[in-house]
A protein has these predicted regions:
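A short, well-structured juxtamembrane/interface segment
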Residues: 51-66
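Short glycine/serine/threonine-rich phosphate/pyrophosphate-binding segments
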Residues: 80-83, 139-144, 165-169, 203-207
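N-terminal glycine-rich anion-binding loops that anchor highly charged ligand groups
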Residues: 28-42
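Long, charge-dense
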Residues: 89-130
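C-terminal functional extensions of proteins
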Residues: 166-220
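Charged, compositionally biased N-terminal leader segments and the immediate start
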Residues: 1-31
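Feature captures the catalytic cores and cofactor-binding loops of soluble hydro-lyases/lyases
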Residues: 126, 140-158, 167-170, 176-177, ...
Length: 220
């Protein structure tokens, strides 16, 4: 049996991005944000996420500069870390996830929290100037914001895409409140440039896609 379908990788990408730009309303987004959002939509298949995006307008510039300077990428889940394309990273940046570290369960038990939240404690030495990608656990984002409020860090950018029915909405609302203003188009974050998707939607693929988009724009 022969099935007629598009096989050429470059043609598939080209057609995909053309479809996204046709179907998604990117007209109100700054050009650098729009380019990242195209990659984000490509990862999730949902063009309607544009209306739920909240960001500080310096997030792309800050993320690019951080990666160029060799900043580590701190991930809340292995799925996020595995989704980051190493060959795109401009400075052989480390991609780190501490959830599987043998000391993480001990820390989680001590703190009476999730492993994902406890893993943030291991980020502390590398948090300043890092690119943080949260694509799974709301507890990670909550704890990160607590740590930043304590005066630790801050990272260069926060990519906040926790997903789910418990804590995802609230953690992203706190991110917006703490790092910007409660407005869909934030001029400048008060503390840390960020990009997030309000509501329950998110996921590892989204978080990794944004890291890849930032990295791709820096690759010469």
């Amino acid at each position: 049996m022969t099935v007629d379908y598009l096989r050429d990788p470059k043609s598939i990408y080209r057609q995909s991005f053309a479809t996204i730009r046709k179907e998604a309303d990117l007209s109100k987004l700054p050009e650098d944000i729009a380019d990242v959002v195209v990659r984000l939509i490509h990862a999730c298949g949902m063009t309607d996420i544009v209306e739920d995006l909240v960001f500080s307008k310096d997030v792309v510039r800050s993320g690019r500069e951080a990666l160029q300077q060799g900043a580590p990428v701190l991930c809340d889940a292995r799925m996020v870390a595995e989704g980051v394309i190493r060959s795109l990273l401009p400075a052989e940046n480390e991609v780190l996830c501490w959830n599987s570290h043998p000391e993480c369960p001990v820390m989680a038990k001590k703190m009476e929290t999730t492993r994902s939240a406890a893993a943030v404690e291991f980020w502390r030495p590398q948090l300043v100037g890092a690119v943080v990608a949260v694509g799974n656990a709301p507890t990670t984002l909550f704890r990160l914001l607590e740590v930043i409020a304590e005066g630790v860090g801050p990272p260069a950018v926060i990519l906040g895409f926790p997903v789910g029915f418990v804590g995802a909405v609230e953690s992203k609302e706190l991110l917006i409140k703490q790092c910007g203003i409660q407005n869909q188009r934030v001029e400048l974050g008060k503390t840390v440039p960020f990009l997030t998707l309000s509501g329950r939607r998110g996921g590892s693929a989204m978080a990794a896609a944004v890291v890849n988009a930032l990295a791709k724009t820096t690759k010469t």
